[in-house]
Swiss-Prot record:
Pathway: Cofactor biosynthesis; (R)-pantothenate biosynthesis; (R)-pantothenate from (R)-pantoate and beta-alanine: step 1/1
Family from the record: Belongs to the pantothenate synthetase family.
Residue sites binding (R)-pantoate per the record: Q59, Q151
Annotated source species: Bdellovibrio bacteriovorus (strain ATCC 15356 / DSM 50701 / NCIMB 9529 / HD100)
Amino acids binding ATP: 28-35, 145-148, 174, 182-185
Protein name, entry field: Pantothenate synthetase
Enzyme class label: ligase
Gene coding for it: panC
Subcellular location(s) per record: Cytoplasm
Family matches, as SUPFAM superfamilies: Nucleotidylyl transferase
Any single GO BP term: pantothenate biosynthetic process
Chain positions recorded as beta-alanine binding sites: Q59
Pfam families in the record: Pantoate_ligase
Record's subunit section: Homodimer.
EC number, UniProt record: 6.3.2.1
C-alpha cells in the first residue's frame, strides 16, 4: 500500500523511521510510461521508492501553461501502487514555499541558454524546488529522464556544487513507437497535431545540421524556438498549436 504524505513535516516524520536506500522520482504528475521507467529503475536498485507529485508554479513563466498542465491523480496513484512505490510526497504550494519564493537557487551560465533563453526564470524554479525536495526526501539516488537533458545537467551541477550526498541517475528518453518523446504535454495535442509531432524526432535525427532540422520543422508548420547543437547533443524546442515540445538526441 502506497502511503500518501502531504506536508514536509509529515513526510520527514515518516522518513526518520525508514532505513536502507531510498530511490526518488520527482514529478509534476500526469504520469506516463517514461515516468514508469524511472520508477522501475528506482525499484530495482533501492530498498524504498519515493515519488513526489508537485506542479511547481515557480518554473512556469506562462501562467496559462500552468493552468493547462494536466492533472491525473487517480491514474498517477494507480501507477505508483502497481509499481510498489512506498510513499508519495504530494505537497501544496504553501508547504513547499513558506517563504513565498523569497529564497531561490540559481545558476547563471548554462541556465541562460537553450530553454533558459526562451523561459526566463524557469531553471531558478526547477533548481529551487528540486533542492527543497532533496532536503525533505533525503534520497540515496534520484532518477531523471534524459528528455529534459538541460535540466538533468543543471541538477547534476547543483548536487556537485553544494556537496549534496546523493547520486543523480540519468535514464534514457522513453519514446512512442513513432519516435515522439513521452511527455505529459502530449496529452494536450489534438489528434491532428499528434500525427505531426514525431517530425521533431525525425528532423533532429536525420538532418545533417541544426539549421536544416529547423528549416524542415518550420516547413511542416512548427513554430521553432531553437534547434541547437551543444557538444555531442542536438536540442530542439518547437510549438505545435498551443503545445511546446522539447527533445534532444546524441549526434
Amino acid at each position: 500500500m502506497t502511503q500518501v504524505l502531504r506536508s514536509p513535516s509529515e513526510f520527514q516524520a515518516w522518513r526518520r523511521k525508514q532505513s536502507g536506500t531510498v530511490g526518488f522520482v520527482p514529478t509534476m504528475g500526469a504520469l506516463h510510461t517514461g515516468h514508469e521507467e524511472l520508477i522501475k529503475q528506482a525499484r530495482k536498485n533501492n530498498d524504498l521508492v519515493v515519488l513526489s507529485i508537485f506542479v511547481n508554479p515557480t518554473q512556469f513563466n506562462d501562467p496559462k501553461d500552468l493552468e493547462k498542465y494536466p492533472q491525473t491523480w487517480d491514474q498517477d496513484l494507480a501507477m505508483a501502487e502497481r509499481n510498489n512505490v512506498d510513499a508519495i510526497f504530494f505537497p501544496r504550494y504553501p508547504d513547499m514555499y513558506p517563504d513565498n519564493y523569497r529564497y531561490k537557487v540559481s545558476e547563471n551560465e548554462y541556465s541562460t541558454l537553450l530553454d533558459g533563453a526562451h523561459r526566463p526564470g524557469h531553471f531558478d524554479g526547477v533548481l529551487s524546488v528540486v533542492m527543497k525536495l532533496f532536503n525533505v526526501v533525503r534520497p540515496t539516488k534520484a532518477y531523471f529522464g534524459e528528455k529534459d537533458f538541460q535540466q538533468l545537467t543543471l541538477i547534476q551541477g547543483m548536487v556537485e556544487s553544494f556537496f549534496m550526498d546523493l547520486e543523480i541517475v540519468p535514464v534514457p528518453t522513453v519514446r512512442e513507437e513513432d519516435g515522439l518523446a513521452k511527455s505529459s504535454r502530449n496529452l494536450r495535442l489534438t489528434p491532428e497535431e499528434r500525427k505531426k509531432a514525431p517530425a521533431i524526432f525525425k528532423a533532429i535525427t536525420n538532418s545533417k545540421t541544426a539549421a536544416e532540422a529547423a528549416a524542415s520543422l518550420s516547413a511542416q508548420g512548427f513554430i521553432v524556438d531553437y534547434v541547437t547543437d551543444v557538444g555531442n547533443r542536438r536540442f530542439v524546442a518547437a510549438k505545435l498549436g498551443e503545445v511546446r515540445l522539447i527533445d534532444n538526441v546524441q549526434i
